[in-house]
Curated annotation (Swiss-Prot):
Residues 98-170 form the PRC barrel domain. Binds ribosomal protein uS19. This is Ribosome maturation factor RimM. One of its GO terms (cellular component) is ribosome. Transmembrane segments: none annotated. Keywords: Chaperone, Cytoplasm, Ribosome biogenesis, rRNA processing.
Length: 173
């Protein structure tokens, strides 16, 4: 496990919520509850610098989280945050249930089939209505792999490897 000072990508500001400066957050772990206990978050500025904000309140809103930051009380003050990535210190985040991962722990993994064939590197994750989709880049092509329990057989964080069982015909697409 990494040090507690490591920053972890936890989500993205998808929209404002109401007129009092609240933000609608799309979590990147699939676990809405993991964001409800945060007392501070970091927002990455366009230049890459992190800005820290104290969280006044948070609540679940379906598959999203509504966060109120102490520094803001008006929608106009938070409009510049829409679309920005959110980070937290790993030490502030709860341990996820088995077989759930924070995005930062998956991005960069080498993806291989159960037969040992290298498919490439996991470079992005697409959030869909039902299950996430892993974007794997390798051998000059992009492969979209559904993030399903019967497809993702193993994630070995130490070896930085994900083993998958591809659905019939997926590589033919």
């Amino acid at each position: 496990m990494s040090s507690g000072n490591e920053t972890v990508l936890i989500g993205k500001v998808s929209a404002t919520h109401g007129v009092r400066g609240q933000l609608r957050i799309t979590p990147f772990s699939g676990d809405v509850d993991s964001l409800l206990t945060l007392r501070s978050i970091m927002v990455k500025k366009p230049g890459g610098e992190m800005e820290i904000f104290a969280v006044a309140a948070s609540k679940a809103h379906g598959k999203k989280v509504i966060i109120t930051l102490k520094a803001f009380d008006n929608i106009n003050q938070v409009l510049h945050l829409v679309g920005r990535e959110l980070y937290a210190l790993r030490e502030q985040l709860p341990e996820l249930p088995e077989d759930e991962y924070y995005w930062c722990d998956l991005l960069g993994l080498q993806v291989v089939t159960e037969e040992g064939e290298s498919l490439g590197e996991l470079v992005d994750i697409i959030v869909t209505g039902s299950n996430d989709v892993y974007v794997v880049q390798g051998s000059g092509r992009e492969i979209l792999i559904p993030a399903l329990a019967d497809v993702v057989l193993d994630v070995d964080s130490d070896a930085k490897r994900m083993t998958v069982s591809l659905p019939e015909g997926l590589l033919d697409l």
